[in-house]
């Protein structure tokens, strides 16, 4: 029963942090020091990734009509624009498949230390602050997602590959990359949400396949723990997405940059004390 309660807390953390540019992985690893699940390491490692399925579903629910090319209420032109969004998403996910997939095992084995997580949290926090200072003096060249080219989408996808390093933040890397290319905060944020669907589904599926292929099965209340975490992450992520979409219309990402730096320092302290 205690693990169910811990799964609720971890689901809240995942839901809050998955789409904010502050690294869900960094938060989950930090939480693991404090409220570690009383489960085998193999299950915990799988749980930390697959729990994000709940967060992905929140994107689908919020954007179901916009991302549905078969919606009867849409005109032929609108359906065409929806297909174009999916073509851009496919273009953006290609770098993760071509570059990221072959490196996945190596990254899991060599880049999950607290040193790496704290470093990426701090580095990308600084980058967000620097970018916003630069961005404040210029107007974005891309303010409409429908006008984004497949080439631009592909470049954003290249930035997403960087997020395979724990602590980077998938949303952080893609939003940062999109803004560097010239996207408005809103377009960068929204496209990051869309790109999360195939990327996170793929990552979760890969983790599950590895889990079962290694001979593991769900025992005891493990399935319940996973499902509870996913449901909670869905609810909280839904609220987080709504918040961020409203936030970026009138605010910048500097607070998230500073937050990342502080969190990176906390992870460093925890690593030195508890590792």
From Swiss-Prot:
What Enzyme Commission number does this protein have?
Answer: 3.6.1.27
Which Pfam families does the UniProt record give?
Answer: BacA (PF02673)
Annotated InterPro entries: UppP
Where are its TM segments located?
2-22, 43-63, 83-103, 111-131, 161-181, 186-206, 225-245, 255-275
> Its principal location?
membrane
Q: Name one GO molecular function term.
A: undecaprenyl-diphosphatase activity
Keywords attached to this Swiss-Prot or TrEMBL record, sorted alphabetically, are: Antibiotic resistance, Cell membrane, Cell shape, Cell wall biogenesis/degradation, Hydrolase, Membrane, Peptidoglycan synthesis, Transmembrane, Transmembrane helix
Q: Where in the cell is it found?
A: Cell membrane
Q: How does it sit in the membrane?
A: Multi-pass membrane protein
The UniProt entry's GO biological process terms, in alphabetical order, are: cell wall organization; peptidoglycan biosynthetic process; regulation of cell shape; response to antibiotic
The catalysed reaction is: di-trans,octa-cis-undecaprenyl diphosphate + H2O = di-trans,octa-cis-undecaprenyl phosphate + phosphate + H(+)
EC class name: hydrolase
Tell me a GO cellular component.
plasma membrane
Q: What else is known?
A: Bacitracin is thought to be involved in the inhibition of peptidoglycan synthesis by sequestering undecaprenyl diphosphate, thereby reducing the pool of lipid carrier available.
Q: Which family does the similarity line name?
A: Belongs to the UppP family.
PANTHER family according to UniProt = UNDECAPRENYL-DIPHOSPHATASE
Q: What does this protein do?
A: Catalyzes the dephosphorylation of undecaprenyl diphosphate (UPP). Confers resistance to bacitracin.
Q: What is this protein called?
A: Undecaprenyl-diphosphatase
Q: What organism does this protein naturally occur in?
A: Lactobacillus delbrueckii subsp. bulgaricus (strain ATCC 11842 / DSM 20081 / BCRC 10696 / JCM 1002 / NBRC 13953 / NCIMB 11778 / NCTC 12712 / WDCM 00102 / Lb 14)
């Amino acid at each position: 029963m205690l693990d169910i309660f811990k799964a609720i807390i971890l689901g809240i953390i995942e839901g809050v942090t998955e789409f904010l540019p502050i690294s869900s992985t960094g938060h989950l690893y930090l939480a693991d020091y404090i409220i570690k699940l009383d489960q085998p390491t193999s299950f915990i490692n799988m749980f930390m990734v697959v729990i994000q399925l709940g967060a992905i579903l929140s994107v689908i629910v919020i954007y179901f009509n916009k991302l549905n090319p078969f919606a009867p209420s849409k005109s032929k032109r609108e359906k065409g624009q929806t297909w174009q969004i999916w073509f851009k998403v496919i273009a953006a996910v290609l770098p993760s498949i071509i570059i990221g997939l072959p490196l996945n095992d190596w990254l899991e084995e060599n880049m999950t230390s607290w040193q790496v997580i704290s470093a990426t949290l701090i580095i990308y926090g600084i980058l967000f602050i620097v970018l916003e200072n630069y961005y404040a003096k210029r107007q974005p060249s891309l303010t409409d997602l429908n006008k984004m080219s497949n080439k631009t989408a592909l470049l954003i996808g290249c930035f997403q590959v960087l997020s395979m390093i724990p602590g980077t933040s998938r949303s952080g890397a893609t939003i940062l990359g999109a803004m560097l290319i010239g996207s408005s905060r809103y377009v960068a944020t929204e496209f990051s949400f869309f790109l999360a669907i195939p990327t996170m589904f793929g990552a979760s599926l890969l983790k599950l396949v590895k889990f079962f292929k290694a001979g593991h099965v769900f025992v005891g209340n493990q399935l319940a723990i996973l499902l509870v975490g996913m449901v909670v992450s869905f609810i909280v992520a839904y609220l987080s997405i709504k918040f961020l979409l409203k936030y970026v219309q009138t605010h910048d990402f500097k607070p998230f940059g500073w937050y990342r730096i502080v969190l990176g320092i906390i992870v460093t302290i925890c690593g030195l004390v508890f590792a």
